[in-house]
Amino acid sequence: MKQLKRKRKSNFSVQETQTLLKEITKRKEVIFSKQLNTTINVMKRMAWEEIAQCVNAVGEGEQRTGTEVKRRYLDWRALMKRKRMKANMKLVGSGFPLPTSDLDDSLTEDIDEKIAFRNDANFDWQNVADFRDAGGSLTEVKVEEEERDPQSPEFEIEEEEEMLSSVIPDSRRENELPDFPHIDEFFTLNSTPSRPTYDEPHLLMNIEKQKLELEKRRLDIEAERLQVEKERLQIEKERLRHLDLEHERLQLEKERLQIEREKWRLQLVSTEKPALENELGQGEKSMLQPQDIEAEKLKLERERLQLEKDRLQFLKFESEKLQIEKERLQVEKERLRIQKEGHLP
């Protein structure tokens, strides 16, 4: 099986490590953010890439990547923890009154920084040369196919916050750090706000504002659409009311015609009664003549009612057609208005 070829890079110099620590403190709010989402992860990756660019600007010859500077920082943190544990063990061995609970905490790498750095002048945390004594595996960066994922659990937020606390030294040792002249930046992190180095938050805010504006416009259009729907329902209600009124009018007209018909029948009966009394001797022809007249009148009345019914049906059809045309024009007007608003900036 063919082995993977490994390419070793040179160790980080003192100047590169000091630049790395300074750039990390400038980006504290982003790198050690407790928020967990895609945007924050992207901002963290960009922050490490910017730190790598600052380290490369030192001009030591090696081109570092964001993953390499992040791994270097984790190795530096691990070395500081081991040195802190050794210092605590020395304090315990020399008779320093360290409580048992603090000793347990030191063994679990959670001891207080003030105890960890107390009375140990030889524990020079910024002495980057100590990395060479800690083993080459901490400083060698191997370019392989199986590279560690920067988003793996070893980069958890709690570990990164502890890492930051390891960077900040005791203020009483400020004058003992000649290799790190800008160490005062570590003291003022909590008292002075750091200068914003990213435009991403402003960009995100602008994107959110645009989203809110689009959502507001969409809600306005939805409200107008609901208003149009409400008006359409109101028009439909009015149309149904008119149809009911028309139905009632037709019913009244039918009753009126019924009354008219009854009246005509009574008139015929009253006019035919004397004729029947005076002409009892006439034949069958004279008796059937009034019945023929009545049948003819009923036929004419029926035809007139049918014509009236057809006329009303035609008017109803025309009314519905006009109503549909009105609604179509209203919908077309609304579509043109929405299209016009959609082209606005």
UniProtKB/Swiss-Prot annotation:
Region (Disordered): 141-175
Record has Glycoprotein as a keyword: no
Domain Myb-like residue range list: 4-77
Phosphoserine PTM positions: 106
Keywords recorded for this protein, A-Z: Coiled coil, Isopeptide bond, Phosphoprotein, Ubl conjugation
Bilayer-spanning residue ranges: none
Cross-link annotation Glycyl lysine isopeptide (Lys-Gly) (interchain with G-Cter in SUMO2), location: 9, 114, 142, 237, 254, 273
Modified residues (Phosphothreonine): 188
Phosphoprotein recorded as keyword: yes
Gene Ontology cellular component list: nucleus
InterPro entries: MSANTD4, Myb_DNA-bind_5
Coiled coil region boundaries: 202-344
Protein name per its UniProtKB record: Myb/SANT-like DNA-binding domain-containing protein 4
Upper lineage: Eukaryota, Metazoa, Chordata, Craniata, Vertebrata
Gene of this entry: Msantd4
